[in-house]
Amino acid sequence: MANNEDKLRDYLKRVTAELQQNTRRLREIEGRTHEPVAIVGMACRLPGGVASPEDLWQLVAGDGDAISEFPQDRGWDVEGLYDPDPDASGRTYCRSGGFLHDAGEFDADFFGISPREALAMDPQQRLSLTTAWEAIESAGIDPTALKGSGLGVFVGGWHTGYTSGQTTAVQSPELEGHLVSGAALGFLSGRIAYVLGTDGPALTVDTACSSSLVALHLAVQALRKGECDMALAGGVTVMPNADLFVQFSRQRGLAADGRSKAFATSADGFGPAEGAGVLLVERLSDARRNGHRILAVVRGSAVNQDGASNGLTAPHGPSQQRVIRRALADARLAPGDVDVVEAHGTGTRLGDPIEAQALIATYGQEKSSEQPLRLGALKSNIGHTQAAAGVAGVIKMVQAMRHGLLPKTLHVDEPSDQIDWSAGTVELLTEAVDWPEKQDGGLRRAAVSSFGISGTNAHVVLEEAPAVEDSPAVEPPAGGGVVPWPVSAKTPAALDAQIGQLAAYADGRTDVDPAVAARALVDSRTAMEHRAVAVGDSREALRDALRMPEGLVRGTSSDVGRVAFVFPGQGTQWAGMGAELLDSSPEFAASMAECETALSRYVDWSLEAVVRQEPGAPTLDRVDVVQPVTFAVMVSLAKVWQHHGITPQAVVGHSQGEIAAAYVAGALTLDDAARVVTLRSKSIAAHLAGKGGMISLALDEAAVLKRLSDFDGLSVAAVNGPTATVVSGDPTQIEELARTCEADGVRARIIPVDYASHSRQVEIIEKELAEVLAGLAPQAPHVPFFSTLEGTWITEPVLDGTYWYRNLRHRVGFAPAVETLAVDGFTHFIEVSAHPVLTMTLPETVTGLGTLRREQGGQERLVTSLAEAWANGLTIDWAPILPTATGHHPELPTYAFQTERFWLQSSAPTSAADDWRYRVEWKPLTASGQADLSGRWIVAVGSEPEAELLGALKAAGAEVDVLEAGADDDREALAARLTALTTGDGFTGVVSLLDDLVPQVAWVQALGDAGIKAPLWSVTQGAVSVGRLDTPADPDRAMLWGLGRVVALEHPERWAGLVDLPAQPDAAALAHLVTALSGATGEDQIAIRTTGLHARRLARAPLHGRRPTRDWQPHGTVLITGGTGALGSHAARWMAHHGAEHLLLVSRSGEQAPGATQLTAELTASGARVTIAACDVADPHAMRTLLDAIPAETPLTAVVHTAGAPGGDPLDVTGPEDIARILGAKTSGAEVLDDLLRGTPLDAFVLYSSNAGVWGSGSQGVYAAANAHLDALAARRRARGETATSVAWGLWAGDGMGRGADDAYWQRRGIRPMSPDRALDELAKALSHDETFVAVADVDWERFAPAFTVSRPSLLLDGVPEARQALAAPVGAPAPGDAAVAPTGQSSALAAITALPEPERRPALLTLVRTHAAAVLGHSSPDRVAPGRAFTELGFDSLTAVQLRNQLSTVVGNRLPATTVFDHPTPAALAAHLHEAYLAPAEPAPTDWEGRVRRALAELPLDRLRDAGVLDTVLRLTGIEPEPGSGGSDGGAADPGAEPEASIDDLDAEALIRMALGPRNT
């Protein structure tokens, strides 16, 4: 019975244990299934110039509206697309949206993608790559560290047709092979995984508008199931064409103004937008364990489908309610636990009420009136970013949690009356609401909705990051707080940008801990080729180092081979060396203590006492002190290097330095090394001191030996370099040698020692050293040891007492040692000493690095040396001087991508005339970080100084001198006042706030007269208009911009640019102004508006066959000012020919004008009635009288204002009278006409402007200003609702505008004259399309663009593809298509290189390889192809590798293997291979005649020998009897029917040479 009870008890125990185990497993499974997921990194690109999550927060917290007009750089027919009629086929009634105006920008080089492949890539792929990299960096993770990991990649997107409508472009052979991977949607995720080298799940999700939130849901599920441990989740949308606008216009789904008015009564549709957002997520438990900063937590998510509901694209309320409840269940939360919902909120009349009712039915039923559910919509700020909408909403809510504020929802006139708001407690965020942390210990929570037009719905529940556990205080770094801030980049330009970003970060983040930031920079940033390090012990010191080029350690990491430690001999010592490190470096102090113990057996003094210079301690003047101390310092510094991760692959010692090298190599124990250095130095002190000397000469060894022939007491002691030789011996002869060298101009330096190492004098201590060093126990080195005594590697235990005598007696071969090591692949030589003495003798082909320096023996110098090593490519372990990672890493700037524009050009057919049409457009700029100014600035003001503006300049760091320049101040008076200001330091910049042309001209002239060369900025208000929604430009102020464009050409050295402010600049606008003045944008024509910074661009204005908006024909009376001049008469003829009944031609001379009579007859013959009137068009009374006299039966219907006065003088000699004359007829006349005809119904009001006002023209400053006035006047009339068209003409053929000397000038520079008939056809088109402005010019961009920018680079022309291409063309490099074949079969390019001297061939061949590689990849310059960078990193794939092989095969005249590029993986390696194969000099010829024959034969193909009739003779010389009929007999004829000499003709030149000059057959 008892036995059964025991069995039952055991059974119950077992079952209970199993139940407990199963319960625990179920609990674990349940926990994993619902485990929260941490968001640890975020990145985005959104409308309004948003380039980061912080930018997004600034936008929404500031109630920013990011909606803008259509982009003008994508080939869209911006004007032709618009039609207010929603039924107009192929048109849209909406012409605004949320755009990424830099969507075409991409740093292809950074990602190792060739320009050609980048051009073929959907911009969505490029944005996804960029933001993915930034999201990882923002998490404090080095993206390259993820290679080989199971990172998941989940990206939402949809096909937007980047290549649609680009037929001609995509058929380009250059893009073949790239279009599939470039356009296919699956590559959105696949390319990210490929670039990062990850092998986890990679999925592209297309559920339309809900794509990115579905992607996040899938990422969460994958993490919970263990399919990956970390994941990227996000979405992207770019609209390369306007198809979406057209399609949704037919459905009447768009907001007319492009703005989503979410949940508002005024809602009228959604505003399409673009964007990209990426999150880096991992399981919460992993994030905590890995020490990653947690931004927020995904508590739960759900996805469902509408199914067969009210329509395929219609939203379905019940499905939305279900997905919300499922997400809450997944989060294990109740509706009342959520504070706010970031709604889908598109602003449609159908969708918003359905969504609101679903929210009210779920959340709204469990919220109180005191704590209602808040409802917001990011789309009201940026529009509907489609596949990126969900992730954008998540980023907004994460930022709201972090900042404790719920932003306002814009454009709500009142909450929608289509929603029953009383049915639940949901409150629309019509104003911002504080969102503080909860006092009851609860957590803030938000939910985000995203509903796809496809019917797929997603809902995600977010929670604020859990409270961070108190971490132990950050340990102060060893060494007194001196830390490195390393930064690196792929290119020098990117490095400079990185440095600038980090400097701005240090300046703006006063709370940053330098050591924590250093740890983050080391751990979370990829170490790239171009490197810099700031070293300092405080934020201020590091900031200052970043701001000053001389404060940084810089270098490159290319061609890193093996590392050798170099230990010098005497001469590195200085009093106090190493003392600071005893206190700041534990590793150094510990090693010195070991040395102290070892040395103490042989010396009666204390190592530490000597180093610290304690009273009574011996000095370094004694050889028996200095050598042991130097040894101890060197081996201790070696320990420090090794502690920081630098392990030598070899050691080299110079003289006594070989003792330290032997110890570090393991060839001597520390005790034996101490014995050698102490006892040998004692012997030197006892027997050699005072009897010798040493001298260093700047000569090679041979030259020194020649000089020593006259000195029997001297010998070469050491050969340190090609021109660095040391001599030792008799001190008297040393002095005599020094005198003779000085007399001969040879640099000589007597070394401060009184004994002669490496000379015959040493022989007297040979016996003593043999005795005292007997019993040494040398070992085989475990670190390779190269002996400068033997000139070879030491591999056996041979460093006995005899060796150390010989080391002291014989010559030191340091230079040959370095040469040998360099051949063996050693590239970096670290001189381990208290002061570098050998580094400067190293050849330029290797990198020499020091350790300490004289009087710089502390931690700062040590860290700087470590920084120099890292900057030059070595891997440094910074951990010993940095705090341990805590997970609280600072938000450092992410990589400063250096982008270029990649965008397929539209293939829409264009007429030849379209090539003449241009417009001005404004490109939104992405605002850079906080800028600052420095130095003295002069600010010219009118009567009332701009206090706020001046305050902004001062707050940015500028020292401001204000100078008032009134209308009555002439140039002389201004120059005198400027001269009086020029005392003390010079000026950094000049700002003109003048708003009138006359004082502005005087100001520019006075600056030159006063000799002030500081760059001048002209700051205006309302001088330009950046688009349809902007206020029209003020014509008078527009003249300042016309003038400025000419100053830029006439005085490029002292011109900075033009900046236009809004009428009422706020703090943000003034901050943008500072950014512009700092030069950070790189732009020189900038407009600042509430939407940000805009840069002026010239762009093509093709009509693309667009239908005219009206059928314009002249009729009635047409008034032509300047009507008897060349341009006016052309216009008159055209008007008469096309139906004008009455032509009223106005000029100053009237009928007395030359040719007036003939013109009248010609026009009359065309059927028009002609009136020629003498009248000053600038006289309003005279013009009023003239207009009143126009017959009622032919009313005035059109005006053509061609009148103007020539103005071709440089600005420096332009006086007030010239200004009045030029402006009189042109601008005053136009203003009079505008004023007198206001309200008169006209069909056309044409202003003849000029290209001078568009891009400037030298010596036409006032003329350009006048034309800018006309362009602005036309826009002002349009804004008033009256017709106006300004045409900025180029050069006309025949008599007319711009003739004479200027004609030839502009033709030479690429402005070709236009035929008047064709020019007038362009005028007719502009009128038929009712255009406000168009520039018409025939430009040869290959000539004009370089000429226009030769003295001053300008981005103005960047919007014209031909100009951009002309400016990007490499200059002075071999042409990539050079296939001209030289007589040898080589290309002419290689033949030219062959003709160069041998030392110049290698670099020339490398340039040729880089040039061809650049051409294959699509780069504009070989500079973009780094010599040492792998072809795979440069963007080569199998296709482009074969293309490069083909080009180089043509160059060398021989077919190269298909694997050539991959067999020689860098341009430098490939160039070296080609040099050896095709350019290496032949083996030295045994005789001169043989060399001449070889060269002659190498240059002559066999056909030439045969044709010359000498082939038989050459063959006979080789011992071969030619066959009959070979065609090579002297004077003989070939047999036409004979077989060709295949065996001979197939020989290459080298084979023929071997045949001719090889052994003779006997």
Curated annotation (Swiss-Prot):
GO molecular function, one term: phosphopantetheine binding
Start and end residues of each Carrier domain: 1403-1478
Gene3D superfamilies registered for this protein in UniProt: 3.30.70.3290, 3.40.47.10, 6.10.40.10, ACP-like, Malonyl-Coenzyme A Acyl Carrier Protein, domain 2, NAD(P)-binding Rossmann-like Domain
Pathway: Antibiotic biosynthesis
Beta-ketoacyl reductase: region residues: 1116-1293
Residues bearing PTM O-(pantetheine 4'-phosphoryl)serine: S1438
Result after altering E768R: Exhibits a reduced formation of the 10-deoxymethynolide macrolactone
Region (Acyltransferase): 565-866
InterPro entries referenced in this protein's UniProt entry, alphabetically: Ac_transferase_dom_sf, ACP-like_sf, Acyl_transferase_dom, Acyl_Trfase/lysoPLipase, Ketoacyl_synth_AS, Ketoacyl_synth_C, Ketoacyl_synth_N, Malonyl_transacylase_ACP-bd
Top-rank EC class of the record's enzyme: transferase
GO biological process, one term: macrolide biosynthetic process
Active-site residues, as the UniProt record annotates them: C209 (acyl-thioester intermediate), H344 (for beta-ketoacyl synthase activity), H384 (for beta-ketoacyl synthase activity), S655 (acyl-ester intermediate), Y1263 (acyl-ester intermediate)
Keyword Transferase carried by entry: yes
Annotated positions binding NADP(+): T1124, G1125, A1126, L1127, S1147, R1148, S1149, G1150, D1176, V1177, K1226, Y1248, S1249
Coiled coil ranges: none
Region called Disordered, residue ranges: 1519-1548
Cofactor note: Binds 1 phosphopantetheine covalently.
Domain Ketosynthase family 3 (KS3): 34-464
Catalyzed reaction equations: 5 (S)-methylmalonyl-CoA + malonyl-CoA + 5 NADPH + 11 H(+) = 10-deoxymethynolide + 6 CO2 + 5 NADP(+) + 6 CoA + 2 H2O; 6 (S)-methylmalonyl-CoA + malonyl-CoA + 5 NADPH + 12 H(+) = narbonolide + 7 CO2 + 5 NADP(+) + 7 CoA + 2 H2O
EC numbers for this chain: 2.3.1.239, 2.3.1.240
Keywords from the UniProt entry: Acyltransferase, Antibiotic biosynthesis, Multifunctional enzyme, NADP, Phosphopantetheine, Phosphoprotein, Transferase
Impact after mutating R1133E: Exhibits 14-fold reduced formation of the 10-deoxymethynolide macrolactone
PANTHER family: FATTY ACID SYNTHASE (PTHR43775), INACTIVE PHENOLPHTHIOCEROL SYNTHESIS POLYKETIDE SYNTHASE TYPE I PKS1-RELATED (PTHR43775:SF51)
Function: Involved in the biosynthesis of 12- and 14-membered ring macrolactone antibiotics such as methymycin and neomethymycin, and pikromycin and narbomycin, respectively. Component of the pikromycin PKS which catalyzes the biosynthesis of both precursors 10-deoxymethynolide (12-membered ring macrolactone) and narbonolide (14-membered ring macrolactone).
Name of the protein described by the UniProt record: Pikromycin polyketide synthase component PikAIII
Taxonomic placement: Bacteria, Bacillati, Actinomycetota, Actinomycetes, Kitasatosporales
Gene this protein is translated from: pikAIII
